[in-house]
Structures are given as C-alpha cells and as structure tokens.
C-alpha cells in the first residue's frame, strides 16, 4: 500500500459519526497484539487544549533529551501530523505501512462479525502501531 492508497482507505471510513462502545477498538487492538500495552504513556484528557498541552510537553521532553512520541488529533494539513517521533511527523511510507497493517486487522475484525470501526478508532490503532514499529518503545515517553 502506498500513501495515496492509505489516504483513500482512511477517507473511505468517513470522518463523522459516533458509535458509543469500546467493542470495536478493543477487538481491533486485540488483533494487533495490544500495541497500546507496550508503551509508557502520558494521557492528556479534558475538554479543550489537549493537543496544545501534548505538543508543548512533547517538545519540552524532546528538548531535555528524552525520546518522545506524540499522538494528537485533529491534524492541520496531513494525517501524518497526528503521529510524531521526537518532534518529527512520521513519513508517508511509515503512515502507509501502519495503515496497511491496521486495515488487515480491520478486515479480519469485520470478517469475524465485528462492527466497522470509526475513522478515529482506526487512526488511534494506527498511532499505537506507529509508536511501536517506528520508535523504540522501551526508551520513549508517549504523549497522547
């Protein structure tokens, strides 16, 4: 899968629509061998300003010599902006690779009777994978 194919897949999922429940994301990360359990995470919550706080914290830690990875939403220009390693957005090639791996898991999930994950759930699973495959998870602080 190349970057354009990855973007076509992401866009095909649709941006809007809330489907309450954890079944989709739980099933998806299970098929991906729970990448979220392999990373140390600072999880930022709240109503407003989460992306700014995550970005500030990521840059502060990177500037102090820490290895960091950051996942934020939404993006400004490209989806790659949502996933950064040491302050640098992941490459188009890495984005395509984690999209392909996640899509395979989504296809299996649907084949097994699961409900279509939302675009946000798919991108979140992709972020977990990118932080495992691209970075050194045991040496990084992940901010999301």
Predicted regions, residues:
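Single conserved hydrophobic/aromatic residue that forms the stacking wall/gate
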Residues: 133-144
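Electropositive phosphate-/nucleotide-binding environments in soluble metabolic enzymes
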Residues: 4, 19-22, 89-92, 96, ...
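N-terminal phosphate/diphosphate-binding loop that engages ATP/GTP or pyrophosphate donors
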Residues: 56-104
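Feature captures the FAD/FMN-dependent oxidoreductase FAD-binding
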Residues: 130
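Short functional linear segments
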Residues: 1-46, 53-66, 71, 110-114
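Short acidic active-site motifs
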Residues: 127
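ATP-dependent adenylate-handling ligase core
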Residues: 101-120
């Amino acid at each position: 899968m190349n970057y354009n194919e990855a973007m076509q897949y992401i866009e095909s999922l649709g941006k809007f629509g809330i489907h309450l429940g954890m079944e989709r994301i739980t099933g998806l990360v299970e098929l991906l061998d729970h990448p979220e359990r392999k990373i140390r995470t600072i999880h930022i919550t709240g109503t407003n300003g989460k992306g700014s706080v995550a970005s500030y914290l990521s840059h502060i830690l990177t500037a102090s010599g820490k290895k960091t990875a950051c996942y934020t939403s939404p993006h400004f220009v490209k989806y790659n902006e949502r996933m950064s390693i040491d302050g640098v957005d992941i490459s188009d090639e890495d984005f395509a690779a984690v999209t392909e791996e996640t899509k395979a898991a989504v296809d299996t999930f649907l084949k097994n009777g699961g409900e279509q994950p939302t675009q946000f759930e798919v991108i979140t699973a992709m972020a977990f994978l990118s932080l495992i495959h691209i970075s050194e998870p045991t040496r990084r602080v992940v901010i999301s």
